[in-house]
């Protein structure tokens, strides 16, 4: 959790700096719900149940199982990067890539996709709840009240609660990660199924495969067009 949430903050910082330095305004994907009860339920079900199930079968159950034959570390890195691009949003590239790598690591160590499915389900459920909470806020009204210094309603409490939840999970997760790394370093060892081939060469082979080139090109194309507000086509 710590690494995943930390990557989200880093991703936000990087692209905020890029926009400020370049004078551009990137368009993000709106993850908030419609604010209605039906919209909230639909958002939670889609994000916390359907998406994790489909994506874990596709990325960890299929893609990683094939990629790890070149070495578990190679598989973790490459499938993680692919997972980041798969989301088609600059807001989620680093966040999703790190989560994808963590999920692949769990599969590599346990031999099952169920731990990664639980991780994915948990992360998406938290995100869906945050989405529903933020979707209930009229941000135009909130911005106007903030400018006048006359803030009313529950918007401030909701925003603070969402921020504290994310920040708290990040700090707690990072502390536990450092503790685990310090006292159980051997548990982080990965299997190299092709010791005669260097790690760099494995990554190059993966990235230069025709299927990988086409997939990455398509995903990058979608991500860039979405960020520029041009739509998919």
Regions found by a protein language model. Give the residues of each.
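Transmembrane helix-loop-helix hairpins at the membrane interface
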Residues: 39-224, 229
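Juxtamembrane helix-loop-helix connectors linking adjacent transmembrane helices
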Residues: 1-57, 223-233
């Amino acid at each position: 959790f710590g690494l995943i949430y930390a990557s989200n903050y880093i991703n936000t910082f990087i692209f905020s700096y890029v926009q400020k330095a370049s004078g551009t305004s990137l368009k993000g994907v709106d993850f908030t719900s419609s604010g209605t009860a039906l919209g909230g339920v639909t958002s939670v079900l889609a994000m916390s149940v359907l998406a994790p199930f489909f994506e874990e079968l596709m990325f960890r159950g299929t893609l990683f199982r094939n990629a790890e034959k070149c070495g578990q570390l190679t598989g973790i890195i490459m499938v993680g990067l692919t997972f980041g691009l798969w989301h088609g949003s600059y807001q989620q590239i680093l966040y999703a890539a790190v989560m994808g790598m963590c999920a692949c690591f769990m599969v590599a160590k346990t031999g099952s996709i169920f731990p990664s499915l639980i991780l994915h389900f948990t992360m998406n459920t938290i995100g869906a709840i945050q989405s529903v909470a933020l979707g209930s806020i009229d941000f135009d009204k909130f911005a106007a009240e903030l400018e006048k210094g006359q803030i009313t309603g529950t918007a401030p409490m909701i925003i603070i609660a969402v921020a504290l939840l994310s920040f708290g999970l990040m700090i707690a997760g990072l502390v536990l990660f450092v503790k685990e790394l310090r006292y159980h370093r051997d548990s982080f060892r990965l299997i190299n199924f092709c010791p005669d081939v260097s790690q760099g060469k494995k990554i190059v082979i993966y990235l230069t495969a025709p299927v990988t080139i086409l997939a990455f090109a398509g995903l990058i194309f979608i991500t860039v067009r979405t960020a520029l507000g041009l739509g998919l086509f």
